[in-house]
Amino acid sequence: MNCGCHTEQRDFGLHPYVANMEQIAVQNYHFRIAAWTGDYLQMTLMCIPACGEIGLEIHEDTDQLIRVEQGCAVVKMGKCKDNLDFCRSLRRGDAVFVPAGTWHNVSNTGRGALKVTYVYAPPHHPRGTVQHTKADAE
């Protein structure tokens, strides 16, 4: 039975690809899945459960764009791991730019799943990445 959900787990990278980013993000139930990975850019989709978080991280050589497609969140960033002096609330449609070399974390502050689109330049995850849970990502 087809429920109408986007269930294909495929990285469409290296081919032209058109997608409604909000729609495919909302239909994603994996912690992280690479939706498109090129040579210089990557888009992943994430699903963060209520009260969950991405986890504090830094990417020394990768800029990021993070866009909330469903839910609400808080993003914290800073140059030092122990001093995240930038804090903003995010809701559907909001985007945050994370410069390379910046510590950051996104926490789900809503009651439902947080659906997020991540764009990395250059790509950060291996082509075809599928991580069903946060534990799979660690």
Q: Whereabouts are the PLM-identified features?
A:
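A short, N-terminal "cap"/entry segment at the start of jelly-roll beta-barrel domains
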Residues: M1-Q42, G55, R88, K134-E138
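Double-stranded beta-helix
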Residues: C3, Q9-F12, Q23, D82, ...
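Short loop/turn positions at the edges of beta-strands in beta-sheet-rich folds
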Residues: T37, A50, E60-T62, E69, ...
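Conserved short histidine dyad/triad with adjacent acidic residue
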Residues: T44-E60
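Short beta-strand His + acidic residue motifs that chelate non-heme Fe in jelly-roll/DSBH
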Residues: I54-L56, V75-K76, V98, H104-G110
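Glycine- and acidic-residue-biased ligand/ion/polar-headgroup-sensing regions
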Residues: D61-C80
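Short acidic-glycine-tyrosine-enriched beta hairpin
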Residues: C80-P99
